[in-house]
Regions:
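Conserved catalytic scaffold of divalent metal-dependent phosphoesterases
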Residues: 72, 76-162
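Core catalytic region of metal-dependent phosphoesterases/phosphodiesterases
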Residues: 3-104
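Conserved acidic residues
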Residues: 28-30, 132-134, 167
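Contiguous mid-protein beta-loop-alpha structural module that forms a pocket-lining wall or clamp
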Residues: 163-169
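Structural preference for beta-strand elements that scaffold enzyme active sites
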Residues: 63-65, 135-137, 168
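Short, basic, glycine/proline-bearing loop/turn elements
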Residues: 2-5, 37-40, 139-149
């Protein structure tokens, strides 16, 4: 959650460490599953700069795939623009992929990303090829899941069965 006006010095420090670690690890891909923005409808110039730098730096390291989280867009007003699309479009980075809608994206001949978008549930699809490694990307709550600290999510938006046809989720 990049806030509009707070913690930008801290974000820069943490992001700098993240970029350094990623460069050392040399990932094939970077996947971010939502909530880059803290507020979806009131965006500051400071947020735009921080988000732009964040996405550009990730995409400079490896192909970067991003889905929207509930804080990145307005679930109650689908006519409003999300907080990431204008930034991703302006960057025009060849390694930055904003996967806004539900659907399947092939990474190479072996992997498939399936976006289960909270903004596009009507268009969720199952993997098209069970021989690929199929990875579900989702940003939402799952009923009856339990954290490492023992807290249980009683009422989520979906249950764990949404991942049944995927190898990873």
């Amino acid at each position: 959650h990049i806030r509009n006006l707070k913690y930008h010095k801290e974000y820069r420090e943490v992001f700098s460490q993240l970029y350094e670690n990623l460069r050392e690890q040399k990932p094939d891909y970077i996947i971010h599953c939502g909530d880059i923005a803290h507020t979806k409808t009131q965006i500051s110039p400071e947020y735009v700069q921080m988000c732009s730098d964040f996405l550009k730096n990730l995409a400079d390291i490896a192909p970067t795939y991003v889905i929207l989280g509930n804080h990145d867009g307005n679930l109650r007003n689908s006519s409003r623009q999300d907080a990431l699309t204008p930034i991703a479009n302006a960057l025009q980075h060849e390694n930055l992929y904003l996967l806004r809608d539900a659907g399947e994206t092939l990474l190479n001949g072996h992997f498939s990303l399936n976006v289960l978008s909270v903004f596009d549930e009507d268009n969720w699809v199952d993997p098209s090829d069970p021989n690929r490694i199929n990875i579900a990307l989702y940003h939402g709550s799952i009923s009856n899941c339990e954290t490492d600290l023992g807290w249980r999510m009683e009422r989520g938006e979906n249950d764990i069965s949404i991942f049944n046809n995927f190898d990873y989720g």
